[in-house]
Structure formats: C-alpha cells, structure tokens
Regions:
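A short SAM/SAH-binding and catalytic strip from SAM-dependent methyltransferases
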Residues: 1-10
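Residues that cap or flank secondary-structure elements
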Residues: 4, 51-52
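A short alpha-helix capping/helix-coil boundary motif
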Residues: 7, 38-42, 110-111
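A short glycine-rich, Lys/Arg-flanked "PGG" loop and its adjoining helix->strand segment in the class I
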Residues: 10-25
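Short "lid" loop at the C-terminus of a central beta-strand within the Rossmann-like core
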Residues: 26, 31-36, 76-81
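Short, glycine-/aromatic-enriched active-site segment of Class I SAM-dependent methyltransferases
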Residues: 31-51
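Short alpha-helix
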Residues: 52-74
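Conserved Class I S-adenosyl-L-methionine
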Residues: 73-138
Length: 138
C-alpha cells in the first residue's frame, strides 16, 4: 500500500489489516530518511513539510515492530533506481508541456520543471530512501 492514502503507515496498516487473512503478508511502500536533513529548510527543499514527515530506516523498521509486525522482507530502492524514478517525472512534465502549452497549469509545470532536477540532486538525492516492506502480524 501507499501509506499517504491513509495519513501515514500506521493508518495504512489499519486499513490493510482489514483485508489480510491470518498469517498473510502485508506490503507497505514507504519513503524514509537515508540521512536526516540538517535543518527543516533542507527538509522542505526535499519537498516535505518537516523532518518529522518520515522516519529513518531503523526508525521505520522499529515502528513496524511497535505495531506488532515482523519485517520478513524488504526491497530498498538504490540511488540509481531512485534517480530514474525522479527523472521520469521530469520527462513526463516536459512531454506534457509540449502537448499542452496553453493549459492553465503550464506555467506552474514549467516552474516545477525548471527547479526539480537541481533541487533533487542538491537535497533529496542524498536524504531520501524508499522501500517496500513485507510484514506479517505477530
């Protein structure tokens, strides 16, 4: 599950648990801090409102434990994979701008495309990680 749909991983766990058979495996996809930003300003430059928006990887695994789950598998994005994920968004914005130059949102999309690559390589690339975690309730 994508945890933002339920206000975070605890909310997503609660929703997903309703559909899980006993002994079933829950998959949670969640960003985490690879390294905690030194300031709130850097966190905001990463595109979040606060350093408290995400946990570190040890903090996230500990939070799953606190919710009563064993982590039985995890697949973490490496930086190259994350780079490709982010860059695909830039290409999508560029193609959208080419196809929709007169759209009301074109100026906003152009402004985002102008800053997104530099912001990513300056701030988010070193700070963000992302993983999918396989969990089984105890």
């Amino acid at each position: 599950g994508a945890t933002w749909i339920a206000g975070g991983f605890a909310g997503a766990e609660e929703l997903l648990a309703q559909s899980l058979k006993p002994g079933g495996i829950m998959l949670i996809g969640e960003p985490y801090w690879r390294q905690l930003p030194a300031t709130e300003e850097i966190a905001q430059a990463c595109g979040v409102s606060s350093t408290s928006d995400f946990l570190t990887l040890p903090g996230l695994v500990g939070a799953f434990d606190d919710l009563g789950y064993d982590v039985v598998e995890m697949v973490l994005a490496d930086q190259e994979g994350w780079d490709r994920y982010e860059a695909a968004k830039w290409l999508t914005m560029r193609r959208w701008l080419e196809a929709n130059p007169d759209d009301d949102f074109a100026a906003d999309v152009r402004a985002e495309l102008n800053i997104a690559p530099k912001r990513y390589v300056t701030y988010a690339r070193e700070c963000f990680g992302w993983g999918v975690f396989a969990l089984i309730a105890r």
